[in-house]
């Protein structure tokens, strides 16, 4: 089986700043969320966990799986989508004509911002990870957990559900929510 989980809350989540690849750690609420999720989902078996190397995801995985003996591996293909020059911007939705907003409102019309990542790049790297790392293990009967980020997780969820780009954000999950994909 394959499960996916979004990291716990950070201070930047709380003030609506775009995090992207900026390495923001969990805050106390995020750590508590990860511990509570660990209790809530304690009956789900995992053989291995793959996490984004960014601190907020890796720490979520470690707290969530504490005491379960599940190895946590990081992989660069699981980092969050790059938001370029808009990382760290607070409340981008309030900025009139801010180009990053089309990413969230009309993803099919999104034009990659300076220093950012395109949907094609995101889907290529996460798809490669799923095809080359995860599926061979799932096909051998292993239960795998991926701990990542909003957009990165949505790309994997879209791959499994066949979601068109205009519905990309339909796969968005809450912080520390676990979703079974297969």
Predicted regions and their residues:
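Generic beta-sheet signal
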Residues: 2, 140-150
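Short beta-strand scaffold positions
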Residues: 51-52, 124, 147-148
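Short active-site segment of divalent metal-dependent hydrolases/proteases
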Residues: 10, 152-153
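Glycine-rich phosphate-binding loop signature in dinucleotide/nucleotide-binding domains
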Residues: 42-45, 133-142
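Domain-level recognition of soluble alpha/beta enzyme cores
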Residues: 161-182
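Phosphate-handling substructures
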Residues: 67-125
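Active-site-proximal alpha-helix that buttresses catalytic centers in soluble enzyme cores
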Residues: 9-70
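Extreme N-terminal starter segment of soluble prokaryotic enzymes
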Residues: 1-3, 48
């Amino acid at each position: 089986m394959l499960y996916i989980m979004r990291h716990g809350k950070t201070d930047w989540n709380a003030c609506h700043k775009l995090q992207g690849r900026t390495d923001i750690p969990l805050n106390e609420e995020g750590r508590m969320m990860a511990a509570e999720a660990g209790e809530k989902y304690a009956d789900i078996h995992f053989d291995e966990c793959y996490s984004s190397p960014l601190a907020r995801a890796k720490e979520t995985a470690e707290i969530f799986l504490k005491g379960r003996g599940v190895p946590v591996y990081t992989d660069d293909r699981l980092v969050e989508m790059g938001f370029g020059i808009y990382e760290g911007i607070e409340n981008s939705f309030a900025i009139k004509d801010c180009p990053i907003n089309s990413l969230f409102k009309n993803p099919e019309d999104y034009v990659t911002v300076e220093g950012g990542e395109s949907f094609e790049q995101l889907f290529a790297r996460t798809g490669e990870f799923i095809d080359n790392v995860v599926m061979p293990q799932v096909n051998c009967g292993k239960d795998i957990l991926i701990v990542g980020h909003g957009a990165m997780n949505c790309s994997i969820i879209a791959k499994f559900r066949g979601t068109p780009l205009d519905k990309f954000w339909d796969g968005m999950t809450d912080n520390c929510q676990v979703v079974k994909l297969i």
